[in-house]
Amino acid sequence: MATQLQREISNLKKSILTLSALVEDNLRRALTAVETHDETLAAAAIDRDFPIDLMEVDIEEDCLKALALYQPVDGDLRFIVTIIKINGTLERVGDLAVNIAERALQLAAAPQPVVSFDMTGMAIKAQQMVSNSLDALVASDAAAARAVLLADDEIDDLDREFTARLNAAAREHPEWLEGVVQLLQISRFIERLADHATSIAEDVIYMVEGEIPRHSVKRAVAEAMGFNGAVPPRAKE
């Protein structure tokens, strides 16, 4: 039974790595289409989402089957639960790639706003966060996963800065409005990519250490406030 479970875990590792490669490849395709205004590349990114969706379903079914047949515990259980969660997150990253590609098609046909901002740089940073979170998964590296968490605030700041500059450009040049709208959406999608990378990194930390990072932050805040795990008293009316 244990040998069969380890064989299933090995197969799940291979499957999630294959899905990761498909998602990263299509994300690069979509972001390149935005940068180059390549409508053919954008259309290809949209078309290549279907195999990603199919594989996500297959991986989830394999995970549920392993849980039912082998009833794993401890590290094996955490691994399978983590794969279920990351599998779903990767599917959402794939959907974002499609959303970006669709906006790239509309942007290519719209007046191009002239904005002093490196959107490509922001996209590369978010894409690198996704890649680094998946590398942390492959290596079971909690430290590398924590480094991904630290990068999220920078993407949030860049998104806010780009949004402000786009809004200013739209006010000064109403003729750019359609292009501004598409870029605003693309910027928001890039910010969500970073959020998904953060989610994957948190799941890796849970898999390796059994610790849910967002709960550990809440616990630290509670301890600093003197709650020490106890339910705080209700205020008197």
Regions found by a protein language model. Name each.
Residues 1-237:
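Cytosolic, long alpha-helical scaffolding segments
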